[in-house]
């Protein structure tokens, strides 16, 4: 995979940063976006000797900012070949009747609206060139319920369905759409979910060998390296230590 222009959201850490490192080569150009500037700057410095990097501090929840960032790209970066819609997060594990509504708003605005905005403003160029690939990062949480997953799971179910509907919209073009549904992966995800509580975050992975950010990046590499007539629609992957669980069951104590 070389000679491509790749736009990655949520590139400051986790899956996004791993994808940036994977795509970095002399012939690729990377557009890296994230809200957090310092880690984005460090990543740009790390990769600058390997490829051309355009760094954009960006909150994908801001529609006008997304539009301005994409339409304001330097000419040599405007023909985006691959969009990795990675920006997303989970906040809290409270049941629906006790949840902080601000957390719900943040998840909906980031996981759904942010992905929509980036797709909407990148896609016309792909359609005009009759070439491109959109990679949407969903989650097994969008397919399999668990207590406390309420809105987070709902947002990821949206990502999966939106990806499938995009495929229908783009039928007849050479623009591909793929959706990846990772299971448990050890990144900053749980630390963000538990709002900085590192002990709670570490407990999620205790005694397991979870997926890594690099596993997801390698999955992205495989998807985009398929022949142009092959579209990987939806790909679910889990650690060997994870499987589908039964429905939660409440049992009265005798």
Please report, for each region that a protein language model flagged, where it lies by residue.
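Conserved glycine-rich cofactor-binding loop
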Residues: 12-13
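Conserved glycine-rich Rossmann-like NAD(P)H-binding loop of the short-chain dehydrogenase/reductase
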Residues: 26-42
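The beta1-alpha1 cofactor-binding region of Rossmann-like NAD(H)/NADP(H)-dependent oxidoreductases
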Residues: 57-68, 101
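Substrate-binding pocket helix/loop in short-chain dehydrogenase/reductase
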Residues: 94-96, 100-108
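Active-site helix of classical SDR
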Residues: 119, 155
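Residue(s) in the substrate-gating loop at a strand-loop-helix junction
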Residues: 139
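C-terminal helical subdomain
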Residues: 179-183, 199-246
């Amino acid at each position: 995979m070389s000679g491509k222009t790749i736009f990655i959201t949520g590139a400051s850490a986790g899956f996004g940063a791993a994808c940036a490192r994977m795509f970095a080569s002399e012939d690729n150009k990377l557009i890296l976006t994230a809200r957090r500037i310092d880690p984005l700057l460090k990543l740009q410095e790390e990769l600058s000797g390997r490829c051309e990097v355009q760094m954009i501090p960006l909150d994908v929840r801001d529609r006008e900012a997304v539009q301005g960032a994409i339409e304001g790209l330097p000419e040599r970066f405007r023909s985006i070949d691959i969009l990795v819609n990675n920006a997303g997060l989970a906040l809290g594990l409270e049941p629906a009747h006790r949840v902080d509504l601000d957390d719900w708003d943040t998840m909906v605005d980031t996981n759904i609206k942010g992905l929509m905005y980036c797709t909407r403003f990148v896609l016309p160029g792909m359609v005009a060139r009759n070439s491109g690939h959109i990679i949407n990062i969903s989650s097994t949480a969008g397919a399999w319920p668990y207590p406390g997953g309420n809105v987070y799971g709902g947002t990821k179910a949206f990502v999966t369905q939106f990806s499938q509907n995009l495929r229908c919209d783009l039928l007849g073009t050479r623009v591909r759409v793929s959706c990846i549904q990772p299971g448990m992966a050890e990144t900053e995800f749980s630390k963000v979910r538990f709002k900085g509580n590192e002990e709670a975050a570490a407990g999620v992975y205790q005694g397991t060998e979870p997926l890594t950010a690099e596993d997801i990046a390698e999955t992205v590499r495989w998807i985009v390296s398929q022949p142009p007539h092959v579209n990987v629609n939806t790909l679910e992957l889990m650690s060997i230590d994870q499987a589908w669980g039964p429905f939660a069951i409440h049992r009265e104590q005798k």
